[in-house]
Amino acid sequence: MAVLSTLKELVEQLIDPYLFMGIAMRFLPSTILEAIRNGDFSTLLSPSKFKEAWWGNFWAFIGPQVKASAENKVIPLLEGRVKNGRMGDEVVERPINGVVLEIGAGTGMWADVFAKVNVGVNPEEDELRRRKGESGLTRVYGIEPNPKSAATLRRRVKEIGLDGVYEVVPVGIESINDPKAWDGRIEPESVDCIVTILCLCSIPEPEKNVKLLYQSLKKGGRWYAYEHVRIDPSRGFFLRAYQS
């Protein structure tokens, strides 16, 4: 049974990336038609602009599905209910608070979770946080360089009442402290928390940009990560070989 279970998981892992790419291909014709209808020929003639528009349309569809499959792990993480990789019902670590940097914010699919955590996991936890002198979220910077996703993110922020707390930063990680790239600047050692959810696998120059993110953290700052990782050796040879 263990072998069959491993083979089943192997087949699923082999198929999933191709299903993902197949779904993305479905949005290619509609992105072309959208640009033609809008008379946006500069997008059609620019590979980089077209890629951004295509990705924005695709992610608006697939993002909520990604959230649905991950939120049972991500929400406890942000609420401080995860310790040593184990989830529980009690708050055992500090929830996100203060100034937060959300990387790859997309269309705002996690913004409602930020709004929930901002008022505490429950009344008792909220009261405890106040007694300790800790605040909720004072500022959230959502890093989203895709123009289409950033526009949707701004609308989402207003819908859930985080306008004035959540600021959309429409540039990549490499430009977060460059006031010429956007209307603001995130200073080194000014951020309390960083949140990355299934995004570090797709950022450019990961080593350089991860180092830049670390530099933005205050001393004692916290990084909340839910990412693709190297498969556990106990999962079997086939899955490890496929990932390699």
Go through each PLM region and give its residues:
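N-terminal auxiliary segments of SAM/dcSAM-dependent transferases
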Residues: 2-49
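Conserved alpha-helix/loop element of class I SAM-dependent methyltransferases that forms part
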Residues: 64-98, 109-117
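Class I SAM-dependent methyltransferase SAM/SAH-binding core
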Residues: 99-101, 106-178
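A short acidic, Gly/Pro-enriched loop at the edge of an enzyme's catalytic core
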Residues: 178-194
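A short SAM/SAH-binding and catalytic strip from SAM-dependent methyltransferases
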Residues: 192-205
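A short glycine-rich, Lys/Arg-flanked "PGG" loop and its adjoining helix->strand segment in the class I
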Residues: 207-219
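Conserved class I S-adenosyl-L-methionine
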Residues: 222-244
